[in-house]
Regions:
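The conserved cystathionine-beta-synthase
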Residues: 15-34, 39-41, 79-98, 102-106
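Short beta-to-alpha loop/turn elements within the nucleotide-binding domains of ABC transporters
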Residues: 20, 51, 68, 85, ...
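Alpha-helix boundary recognition
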Residues: 7-8, 30, 61, 74, ...
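Short beta->alpha transition motifs characteristic of CBS
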Residues: 34, 38, 46-62, 95-101, ...
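Bateman (tandem CBS) regulatory domains
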Residues: 1-13, 66-78
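Short, flexible segments with low predicted structural confidence
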Residues: 1, 28, 44-45, 61-66, ...
Length: 115
């Protein structure tokens, strides 16, 4: 239960849907000031991964198509924990990430846990 109290719920987060373009995702990232945000499916329930501003900038600087779907640069698709995970598992999972996605008992996106 303690972990659940530390999680920022999805209703309080900036996210993008998997059907947005890289151009749209970059605008969301720039407007929010975050370096990355979660990518969710079209229903807003399933965590697909993260999109990083740095990867979009790199893609754009190399002349990449900004109309590609955000999923073309998706990262960290397997980096998530259960809301009921033990703290021991959390420490090892989050160490190289700005945050880790948290899934509920039905594997729906619940929110994020930050450092």
């Amino acid at each position: 239960m303690l972990l659940k109290s530390l999680v920022k719920p999805k209703e309080r987060l900036v996210t993008v849907r998997e059907d947005v373009t890289l151009e749209q995702a970059l605008k969301v990232l720039e407007d929010s000031g975050y370096r990355c945000v979660p990518i969710l499916d079209e229903t807003g329930q399933i965590f697909r991964g993260n999109i990083y501003k740095m990867h979009i900038y790199r893609h754009k600087s190399r002349g990449g198509d900004m109309q590609l779907p955000v999923t073309s640069l998706l990262k960290n698709a397997t980096k998530f924990i259960s809301v009921n995970a033990a703290f021991f598992n959390v420490f090892f999972s989050i160490k190289d990430l700005p945050y880790i996605a948290v899934l509920d008992d039905k594997n729906a996106f619940y929110g994020i846990l930050t450092h």
